[in-house]
Regions:
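Loop-centered beta-sheet repeat module
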Residues: 91-142
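Ferredoxin-type iron-sulfur electron-transfer modules and their immediate structural context
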Residues: 128, 139-232, 272-305
């Protein structure tokens, strides 16, 4: 296990086997739980991006990338994207009227603070540097996510935006259809191919799959167990506390045991009109909504002070 998978299981109270090697070559092995950690603080230097980009592969061969949970097949066979659209905090406060150094928010369920702009942040593509007490976090909101080039850590952020003036209010009115989503070639992610919007990615589509056990053929080698980026499916069981709603299972199960409408999108690429299925999400709107509603309730009960 690496990264987010370890962080999640420690918070769940599970036992972790640790093996480290010193610079002198000495090996130290131990078994630990969260109780063995005196203090834990997560400091994310580049987090909470203002939405992101969609990717396709126009080449023939599959391409490994951090922007796809599995190698993305060629010939425009599928689209992968990141960003929760109009739920994104920075998208709702584009000029940083409210979200500033010292802003309090919920970071995986724990009270956190904005330390400032994240590394490589810019006016066009802002992100944040965030921190919170790791031991106070809810394991549901963070974990590991496997990509075509290794593991990543996913986190969930909910930032309050008090309406202090008309400009802040107007910024909050933005909706998915008005948020542009750049489309890029996954092999050269800075090469634009066109654009779409977040309404095309999210509106009317399912946030979680339905698993039909009766359709499962108990394959000797289960494709979904192998490719699920959060290890949410094993032993013919779908663990919804781990499911990220990425949609891969619905597209790659050989027996169609998973039912999930992740949608498709009409695009213009290099002068051609094409329809491409959305096969992989790297953002989870369900978790984002849950944490936002949790923050709202804490504010209403005055358990969270702005």
């Amino acid at each position: 296990m690496v990264g987010g998978f370890v962080l999640k299981e420690l918070l769940e109270g599970k036992t972790i086997d640790v093996r480290v090697e010193s610079v002198e070559g000495k090996t130290i092995e131990n078994t630990i739980t969260i109780e063995d950690i005196g203090r834990g603080q997560i400091i994310g230097t580049r987090m909470a991006f203002k939405n992101y980009t969609a990717f396709v592969n126009t080449y023939k061969e599959p391409i490994n990338s951090i922007f796809s949970a599995i190698p993305l097949e060629g010939n425009l066979s599928g689209l992968t994207f990141s960003g929760c659209g109009d739920l994104n905090p920075l998208q709702n406060d584009i000029p940083h009227n409210v979200i500033k150094t010292g802003t309090r928010f919920l970071f995986n369920g724990a009270e956190g603070y904005v330390l400032g702009d994240g590394t490589r942040s810019s006016a066009e593509k802002p992100n944040l540097m965030l921190t919170a007490d790791y031991k106070q976090m809810d394991p549901y909101y963070l974990g590991g996510y496997k990509t075509g080039q290794g593991g990543e850590v996913y986190d969930t952020v909910a930032i309050p935006i008090p309406v202090l003036n008309e400009e802040i209010y107007n910024n909050l009115l933005i909706t998915d259809e008005n948020i542009k989503l750049p489309l890029a070639e996954i092999k050269g992610r800075h090469l634009p191919l066109g654009e779409t919007n977040y309404k095309e990615m999210w509106e009317g589509y399912d946030l979680r799959p339905q698993y039909g056990r009766s359709k499962c053929s108990k394959c000797d080698s289960c494709t979904i167990e192998e490719i699920c980026p959060t290890n949410a499916f094993s032993n013919e069981r779908l663990d919804l506390t781990r499911c990220f709603g990425c949609g891969l299972c619905a597209h790659f199960c050989k027996n169609d045991a998973f039912d999930m409408n992740t949608g498709d999108v009409d695009l213009e690429i290099k002068g051609n009109q094409v329809n491409v299925p959305i096969i992989c999400r790297q953002s989870d709107r369900l978790r984002g909504n849950k944490l936002s509603n949790q923050l709202k309730k804490l504010i209403e009960t005055q358990e969270f002070t702005l």
